């Protein structure tokens, strides 16, 4: 029997997924059913673009519900006591600077289910996170990026 994939995430990330799931089940599902009902009233379904669009949206909503239920069921909560650490681990915010004279950047390393680079939350599967995980403050690390190799120094881990 195959083992199901686990989804490391913070409690906050799990709550966001649970909220999205609740919205999909209680609001979006009903909206889509109503749109299908209205589109059916237009008659011939073979050339009914409103009906096709509503059915496509229904498939998307149901697929997302299934995906969220699986992620929530297989969530592994990352516990963080909020204390500073010297080692980069999942759930920690790491600040580093590009060498030799680059700007400082900070990212929180989270599971892929709650990654949002625009919010400073990167997936533990990303090249940056993979390079930083397990490293310590003061360590110099080579990170492979699409633009080439980047040398950084870890400044802090919180």
Curated annotation (Swiss-Prot):
InterPro entries: GreA/GreB_C_sf, TF_GreA/GreB_CS, Tscrpt_elong_fac_GreA, Tscrpt_elong_fac_GreA/B, Tscrpt_elong_fac_GreA/B_C, Tscrpt_elong_fac_GreA/B_fam, Tscrpt_elong_fac_GreA/B_N, Tscrpt_elong_fac_GreA/B_N_sf. It comes from the Bacteria. Pfam families: GreA_GreB, GreA_GreB_N. Keywords: Coiled coil, DNA-binding, Transcription, Transcription regulation. The keyword Coiled coil applies. Belongs to the GreA/GreB family. Necessary for efficient RNA polymerase transcription elongation past template-encoded arresting sites. The arresting sites in DNA have the property of trapping a certain fraction of elongating RNA polymerases that pass through, resulting in locked ternary complexes. Cleavage of the nascent transcript by cleavage factors such as GreA or GreB allows the resumption of elongation from the new 3'terminus. GreA releases sequences of 2 to 3 nucleotides. NCBIfam families: greA, PRK00226.1-2, PRK00226.1-4. PANTHER family: TRANSCRIPTION ELONGATION FACTOR GREA. This is Transcription elongation factor GreA. It comes from Bacillus anthracis.
